Amino acid sequence: MRWMDAPLAFDGRPGPTDTLGRAMRDLRISVTDRCNFRCTYCMPKEIFGKDYAFLPRDQVLTFEEITRAARIFVSLGVEKLRVTGGEPLVRRDLPDLIAMLAAIRRPDGGALDLTLTTNGSALRALAGSLADAGLRRVTVSLDSLDDAVFGAMNGIEFPVARVLDGIDAAIEAGLAPVKVNMVVRRGINESSVLPMATWARETGVILRFIEYMDVGHSNGWRLDEVVPAADLIETIAAVWPVEPAEPTYRGEVAGRWRYADGGGEFGVISSVTQPFCRDCTRARISAEGVLYTCLFAADGHDLRALLRSDAPDPEITDAIETIWLRRGDRYSELRSAATSTLPRIEMFAMGG
């Protein structure tokens, strides 16, 4: 029997399940479409130059609107909130929003798992206040320890040392364990895989290698630039013996691998070569309040209009529940020449 024919049995916790039996447990909330980097796989500078028109402020969800939406999603079973962008740390007064989100409680009274993904450029300045506001952990995007290679990936001249200092600040503030995401693109930064792994083993951060993905249409994605997760694991294992580790929770997207010598662990996110659609429990809200049920979605659902109308919470709850009940996304499972021509939303706009 194919997996899509067999609904998955989640554990009876509250909330809807989609047409493939997947519950809604994770919500990624973009707080801005702006970013100070121009990463080649997300916002290439050739397209998103200095004159690019980002969203005007009145089209971006307010902190109050974000918090209201998050509270409704939590009532439907969401247990993990991740704040994203763009680059979320460019959003003014972000610790205030973190405090508002941290105050939300699950139906059973438990606290949420509140996390944030950042490029790390402003972490030294903000890590302490984010932790004080209730943030639990951070994930930092870092594609190389070499300044030249890092610049080739992020599109600007920004010192690796400042990102590393931001990671140190996050650890000092208690936002640990820090995870570091490394997108690997053949011909640009695959030579950085072993240096990054060595650094992660020495510092205790959890490094996660991400296959270069075809999100949006601006990054010029080509399959031959993808370094398969299996190759990455083989590269690591040739230096340090590794063994597979069990996932820490249902729906975890990274395959976990443990160093046999006790030197920590690393992860691989293999959306291209080993899709994880069957366990995807994620919903996404963009900075302008559009709900997406897949990272590769062609369109979404306007929550901002509901949030800014006179609609009471139960009406918005019903709308979100209906959207999830009808969800049947599995783009990565179906990836082909045909799907590559479908319209898709850019990663920075959706809040990947």
Language model segments and positions:
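Radical SAM enzyme [4Fe-4S]-AdoMet core and its adjacent flexible, acidic
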Residues: 8, 148, 156-164, 168, ...
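Radical SAM/AdoMet-radical enzyme domain recognition
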Residues: 63-83, 90-210
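Short flanking/linker segments adjacent to small metal-binding domains or redox-active Cys/His motifs
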Residues: 80, 324-352
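A short acidic, helix-capping loop that chelates divalent metal ions and anchors anionic groups
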Residues: 49-53, 124, 146-154, 216-220, ...
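Conserved, mostly hydrophobic/aromatic
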Residues: 31, 39, 83, 207, ...
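Recognition helices and adjacent regulatory flanks at domain boundaries
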Residues: 1-24, 37
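Canonical Radical SAM [4Fe-4S] cluster-binding loop centered on the CxxxCxxC motif
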Residues: 19-61
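Accessory C-terminal segments flanking Radical SAM cores
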Residues: 216-332
